[in-house]
Every structure is written in structure tokens, then in C-alpha cells.
């Protein structure tokens, strides 16, 4: 069926309003739009790693989730979901479960790139019929904006503070999407909030209805941690893809597909400048730092294009 934005947006919300997420939070936007990939007749079981999303949307006895929701611990959301999915298959085989259920895990970059990576990797390698969705906001935002392995190089965080002896985080960010693609699972995709959400909506539905393991990495900007003007979130996302900092691509059964090639690739400073976490890079004498970021972005972009040939 051809994509229809109006029909997609008119689907019933599966995440209720009234939760405690910050105004303009990218994680909430990601969740609402991923869940729009579910067909109306299907139920979902959601597992969630500890993080902004979990502590703000589920505080017993209150929940913003209309589907079944499980929070276990920070590090084991992938294992929890794979266990529930395995139990469902066993019960379905015995005829004890009639309805169709889909299994979705949400985790931030801290619970996905770092603390929960081993349970994510295991679930993907075993090819459980589930979707792991990382809402990547580039740091441990819930506990005070500490750096994670998803934090970009030279970002100012509370554990990589900028000062006379530091220019922020010294390391490049981990390319987790490619790491998961190396697990040879049926579907891997990277996306964010662009194209009236068409890219996110279509990839979410593909991931949810792919047989076997699927992984979505969604760049979900955090106005508090990134220090940009809150209403500018969609502009920030568009700059991320137009500078090729956050390319849009899929890996379907091992085939690499680039979904968006900018007509005019913008310089990386266009993405960095609106964010307070990078303001130190625009002081005199810091030009070389921006050049290093640009060189890494260019290298990764060319590497991606070569994989998609």
C-alpha cells in the first residue's frame, strides 16, 4: 500500500499525553511515530531500558502506554524482549495465544550503545522476531547529560566539560547502526524526523513487520542536552541529514540502500552552530577541530556510499 501521511497521522495514539517528558523531547516524538507503524488490529508488547523515556512515561501505578509495557533494568531490555517473544512463540504453538502481538524495545543511546549492548547483540544474533529502537539523543540525558559512546566528538557534556584543558569529548562517536548491520539480521535502518516523518513511518512499519530481528536507530534531539532553541528540532534534524552527519539508510538482508543524498551537501558547521554544546568550536583558534569533524563525516559518508553501490 502506498504511503499516506494523513492516514498514518490519524492512527490512534498508543502513547498517551500527560507523561513527564520535557517539552519538545525527541524521544517522545520518536516513540509516537514508531508506534504508528503498527497495524490497528495488532497488539504490541513494549520493553524499555531505564532512561528518560521509562522514568517519565511509566511510574507505577501510572503509565502513558496503551500497549503492554515491561521495564526490567537498564542493561537487559533486549534480553527481556527476546524472552517474551520466545514465550509468545511457544504459547502460540500450543494454541494458548490467539491474538497477533508485535515485540518492540525502546532504549536510549546509554542503554543501547553502552550498558545494554550485550543483551541487544545477543537478541539480534539469535534473530528474535522483534524490533529494537534506539532513540539516540547523544548522551545520558536522564542522569545529567553525561557522555556516552554515541556522543559526538568535541561535544560539551558534564563528564567531558569544555575548559582550558579540554575541548569536550575527545573520541568519535560509535557507529552502532553499522555494528548491528554486522550481525547479519534481516533489517537495519537509520532515520530521524525529516520528510514529514515519511522516512521514520515507512521504516518503522518495515521493521515491525519484518520476520526476524530488526533494528532502528532514530536520532532524537534533546533540547536540554544539545542546547538548541526547542522549536527548531525539525531544522536540526534536516541539517543532520543535509550535512551527512546522520545519513538515512537501510540494510535489507545485507543490501545497503542510501535513502537520501543531499542535492547540496552542507558543511558540518551548519549542524554544529545552532547547538550550545558546540559553541566553543566557533571561538578563534578552534577551526582545526571543526575540520577534524568534517573529515570524519566525509570519510563515513564516502564509506556508506561505497557499501551501497
Model regions: which residues?
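Electropositive phosphate-/nucleotide-binding environments in soluble metabolic enzymes
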Residues: 12, 24-28, 74-78, 170, ...
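Short gly/pro/ser/thr-enriched loop/turn and capping motifs at secondary-structure boundaries
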Residues: 54, 137-142, 223-225
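Short, conserved beta-strand edge motifs with alternating hydrophobic and charged residues
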Residues: 134, 188-192, 215-219
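Active-site lining segments that contact anionic ligands and/or coordinate catalytic metals
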Residues: 211-215, 246
Amino acid at each position: 500500500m502506498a504511503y499516506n501521511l494523513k492516514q498514518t497521522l490519524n492512527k490512534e495514539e498508543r502513547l498517551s499525553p500527560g507523561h513527564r517528558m520535557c517539552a519538545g523531547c525527541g524521544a517522545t516524538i520518536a516513540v509516537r511515530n514508531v508506534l504508528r507503524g503498527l497495524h490497528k488490529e495488532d497488539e504490541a508488547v513494549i520493553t524499555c531500558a531505564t532512561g528518560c523515556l521509562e522514568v517519565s512515561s511509566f511510574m507505577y501505578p501510572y503509565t502513558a502506554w496503551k500497549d503492554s509495557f515491561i521495564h526490567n533494568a537498564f542493561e537487559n531490555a533486549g534480553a527481556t524482549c527476546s524472552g517474551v517473544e520466545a514465550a509468545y512463540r511457544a504459547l502460540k504453538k500450543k494454541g494458548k495465544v490467539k491474538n497477533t502481538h508485535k515485540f518492540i524495545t525502546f532504549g536510549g543511546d546509554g542503554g543501547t550503545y553502552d550498558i545494554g549492548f550485550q543483551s541487544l547483540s545477543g537478541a539480534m544474533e539469535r534473530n528474535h522476531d522483534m524490533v529494537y529502537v534506539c532513540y539516540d539523543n547523544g548522551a545520558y540525558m536522564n542522569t545529567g547529560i553525561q557522555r556516552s559512546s554515541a556522543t559526538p566528538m568535541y561535544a560539551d557534556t558534564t563528564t567531558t566539560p569544555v575548559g582550558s584543558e579540554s575541548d569536550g569529548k575527545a573520541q568519535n562517536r560509535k557507529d552502532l547502526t553499522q555494528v548491528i548491520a554486522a550481525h547479519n539480521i534481516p533489517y537495519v535502518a537509520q532515520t530521524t524526523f525529516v520528510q514529514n516523518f515519511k522516512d521514520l513511518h515507512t521504516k518503522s512499519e518495515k521493521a515491525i513487520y519484518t520476520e526476524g530481528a530488526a533494528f532502528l536507530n532514530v536520532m532524537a534531539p534533546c533540547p536540554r542536552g544539545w542546547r538548541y532553541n526547542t522549536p527548531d528540532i525539525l531544522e536540526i534534524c534536516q541539517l543532520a541529514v543535509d550535512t551527512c552527519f546522520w545519513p538515512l539508510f537501510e540494510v535489507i538482508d545485507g543490501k545497503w540502500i542510501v535513502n537520501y543524498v543531499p542535492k547540496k551537501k552542507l558543511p558540518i558547521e551548519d549542524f554544529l552552530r545552532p547547538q550550545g554544546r558546540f559553541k566553543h568550536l566557533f571561538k578563534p583558534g578552534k577551526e582545526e577541530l571543526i575540520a577534524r569533524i568534517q573529515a570524519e563525516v566525509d570519510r563515513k559518508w564516502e564509506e556508506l556510499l561505497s557499501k551501497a553501490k
